[in-house]
Amino acid sequence: MSESYASSLVLRFVLTFRASRVWSGSQAETPSLFGHGKVCAPVNAAPHRVVVVGSGFGGLFATKALRRSDVEVTLVARTAHHLFQPLLYQVATGILSEGEIAPSTRIVLRDQRNANVLIGDVTDIDPDTRTVTSVHRGRVTVTPYDSVIVAAGAGQSYFGNDRFAEFAPGMKTLDDALELRGRIMNAFDAAELATDPAERARLLTFVVVGAGPTGVEMAGQIAELSKRTLAGTFRTIDPRDARIVLLDAAPKVLPPFADSLGEHARRRLESLGVEVTLNAAVTDVDTDGLVVRAADGTEHRIEAATKVWSAGVSASPLGAMLASKSDAEIDRAGRVLVNPDLTVPGLPNVFVVGDMMALDGLPGVAQVAIQGGRYAARVIADEVKAAAEGRPVPERRPFRYRDKGSMATVSRFSAVAQVGPVKITGFLAWLMWLVVHVAYVVGFKSRLTTVCNWAWTFLGRTRTQLTVTHQQTEARLALGRLVSLEDARAARETPVRPEQLAG
């Protein structure tokens, strides 16, 4: 090695060492972005890490609202799609395909360079280590965060009778909708083959439990499917003879709406041949039917092959987990009682939005999730920007929900809508429902095909998505049995400790 080359190496080392001493001595300590006072971040500080749990309305809209912020967003969800849940009943009744209401989350966020999508079921959120743990097919992923937005949604509630789920699927996932489509169409096919009148009547009886918006829409579409689309397609049976029953323990249809709107929906359903039974609680469900208890305590049985459960919701178990690690409480539905800024009490960098949050009696509807997700994203973006510019962290304003009204379809050309004190029924409400819902369908192609399918279904009698497979109908129960077998095998292979034998 030449002397000049060795000297240059020594000089370079000295200069580098002095520069590092100057940098480390002048760098100010960076407190949390969610503290008070002025924040001075180093020029080359790592971007703020935001983890979003859930790809529903709250999670997706929160992620998209951060697209122009200097943050790194990781969206963790158990599915690879964004689900437009209010239109699930149209997948179940053959109006829309699953792709039209459930686009790929990765494709939706493809052009958002600061967003990454991870598939996994979130099992833990640790405020101490600031990590989110998720599991996908046995692979455990731990994702660090500076802020987290929890929008894991809610599942179906059977009010402590989870065994009902085997016989009466809910309406919360694509799998639910596809299974219900299979059960509905298979019931008509089986009725065509039945020779016993009682068995045929059972196969042609459809019971929807829950007279909220989902139940009303589902009952109305099963009625129209049987009376319009399937009329004349069978030779032994007449699908128009199908019996559709709508049950609810409440005293009115559409409890969240004004009484006059609920009464309008009830009359319209009855004009379609739907039997509406109120003040009726379901006490038992099995393969062949269900038992109903009336308000006077008497019980009667309805023989029905196809049952749909839309009577209640229960928040994600992540709500109870967060409450156990903070000062938060949960309500009877498992929702977290959040602060006015949608954070978990004691955890100012953990936001909870959508169906998982409980605040001021807000309903579990899409608009609450969308506005909550955008609000949480805006708070994070404002505080990150203030920290980057060395300004005081802005005071958080409380979340304010802007009620844009509630809508529910009853049948084609008929819906109910309530916007503040204004109540609208019939064809005008139905047009409003169409416009609002197509606006929130993600992607131009999906909007276009949705409108086309609506035109074919509502103006004509065609439903283009009535194809069913054996897998759609049987997969959920088969997987459930497989899990039970795996659990039983694991229990057999678990060694017994001496103290257990002694006990």
Segments from the language model and where they lie:
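A Rossmann-like FAD-binding core segment of flavoenzymes
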Residues: 113-131, 223-340, 346, 388
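FAD-binding core/adjacent interface of flavoenzyme oxidoreductases
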Residues: 33-47, 115-207, 296-297, 308
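Short glycine-rich anion-binding loops that position phosphate/pyrophosphate groups of nucleotides
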Residues: 153-156, 219, 313-315
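Low-acidity, Ser/Thr- and Arg-rich intrinsically disordered low-complexity segments
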Residues: 2-8, 12, 18-26
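FAD-site-proximal beta/loop scaffold in flavoenzymes
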Residues: 166-196, 289, 300-372
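Beta1-alpha1 glycine-rich phosphate/pyrophosphate-binding loop at the start
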Residues: 40-119, 123-124, 206, 213-257, ...
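C-terminal, flexible cofactor-proximal segment of oxidoreductases
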Residues: 47, 378-503
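Rossmann-like dinucleotide-binding core of oxidoreductases
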Residues: 200-257, 261-264, 275-277, 364-398, ...
